[in-house]
UniProtKB/Swiss-Prot annotation:
Residues given in the record as iminosuccinate binding sites: 44, 61, 139-141, 160, 254-256, 271
Coiled-coil region(s): none
Cofactor note as given: Binds 1 [4Fe-4S] cluster per subunit.
Xref: InterPro entries: NadA (IPR003473), NadA_sf (IPR036094), Quinolinate_synth_A_type3 (IPR023515)
UniProt gene name: nadA
Protein known as: Quinolinate synthase
UniProt organism field: Listeria monocytogenes serovar 1/2a (strain ATCC BAA-679 / EGD-e)
């Protein structure tokens, strides 16, 4: 999402904020019923509880990408997630389908840490250092422009659900990979595949330089210096506190956490894995969960027979995900009902052409 898109969006009328929860729920329910199969609402796990009940599908990034690619019926897809997810949905759906984002301010700080101009500046420098030995791999939490560059250069997208499989494949294609924008997912995945930390370098996009003290020939993974502002806040101290105060508690974290945190946790995995593992656990088990607060709260509600806490007791929700709320959802649905275009996400054909190559490689491998 760029600044112009944010400025150009319509501002939601204030009367939506003045409506009661009961009124909004009734209106959303009514419009959903009227639109029927012409409307599809995918919803990410990190969304607010007030939005989730209206979802036609709930999932992680991989699940929602797969669902978007399979859905050919709905004319309108109202994406309850963040901007890069809506872009992905637009590229994977038909040209007749319209993807909208209820609030255009719902971006992703991690995705914004990898700018296409920074990437096009980095690539020739890396080619000079390593020659034609690098395959770019981008986390799905990236802009369409980044995905397009990666697709054009033979690379693929990846999610936290399929990271091990995709990165393993990528390392079979070229001698080394360039993983962006999340250094932690890249580091944790590569380490799980047996690559030592000393064989991983950092690419600093601000300085436009490689940060690596070893022999270049030993470098197998180049990590873009980006991170998730939510998962960065889970710390080793959080884990030590759980071990001290709740010795029977099992710790499961998202692989966007730092390597130190992931290494000390009992398990790590995508939001889908976290949800599935806890839901399937025996009654009475105890869990500390290192991921976004909305999801942790929902897991607690859905598992009253278990003791579940956030790994970080002072954790906040993802603030950009939180911009999608019931008033914005209703505002968007009423626009669709009235035949108005609002907050449509449309990726240009040239960008889509190569971004689809990266997305389709991932979906085929998944």
């Amino acid at each position: 999402m760029n600044l112009l898109e944010t400025v150009e969006q319509d501002t939601m009328p204030t009367h939506y904020k003045q409506m009661t929860q009961v009124e909004m729920i009734a209106r959303v329910t009514e419009i959903k019923a009227q639109l029927g199969e012409n409307l599809f609402i995918p919803c990410h796990h990190y969304q607010k509880d007030e939005v989730v009940p209206f979802a036609d599908a709930i999932g992680d990034s991989l699940q929602l990408a797969q669902i978007a690619a399979q859905n050919k019926k709905a004319k309108h897809i109202v994406f309850c997630g963040v901007h890069f997810m809506a872009e992905t949905a637009d590229m994977l759906t038909t040209s007749e389908q319209i993807v909208t984002l209820p609030d255009m301010r719902a971006g992703c700080s991690m995705a914004d840490m990898a700018d296409i101009h920074q990437l096009t500046n980095a690539w020739p420098k890396l080619q000079t250092l390593f020659g034609d030995t690098i395959l770019p791999v981008t986390y799905i939490n990236s802009t369409a422009a980044i995905k397009s560059f990666v697709g054009e250069h033979g690379g693929t997208t990846v999610t936290s659900s399929n990271a091990t499989k995709i990165v393993s494949w990528a390392l079979e294609q070229k001698e080394r990979i360039f993983f962006l924008p999340d250094q932690h997912l890249g580091r944790n995945t590569a380490f799980e595949l047996g690559i030592p930390l000393e064989h991983m370098a950092i690419w600093n996009p601000i300085k436009n330089e490689l940060e690596y003290e070893g022999n270049l020939d030993d470098c197998k993974v180049i990590l873009w210096k980006g991170y998730c502002s939510v998962h960065q806040h889970f710390t080793v101290k959080n884990i030590e506190n759980i071990r001290k105060n709740h010795p029977n508690m099992r710790i499961i974290v998202h692989p966007e956490c730092t390597h130190e945190v992931v290494s000390l946790a009992d398990d790590s995995g995508s939001t889908k894995k976290i949800v599935t593992e806890i839901n399937n656990a025996a009654p009475g088990t105890e869990w500390a969960v290192g991921t976004e607060a909305n999801l942790v709260g929902r897991i607690i509600q859905e598992n009253p027979d278990k003791k579940i806490v956030s790994l970080n007791p002072f954790m906040c929700p993802c603030m950009t995900m939180n911009r999608i709320d019931l008033p914005h959802l209703l505002w968007t649905l009423e626009a669709i009902q009235n035949g108005e275009k609002r907050n449509q996400i449309k990726v240009d054909e040239q960008t889509t052409k190569f971004a689809l190559k990266a997305l389709e490689r991932m979906l085929q491998l998944s």
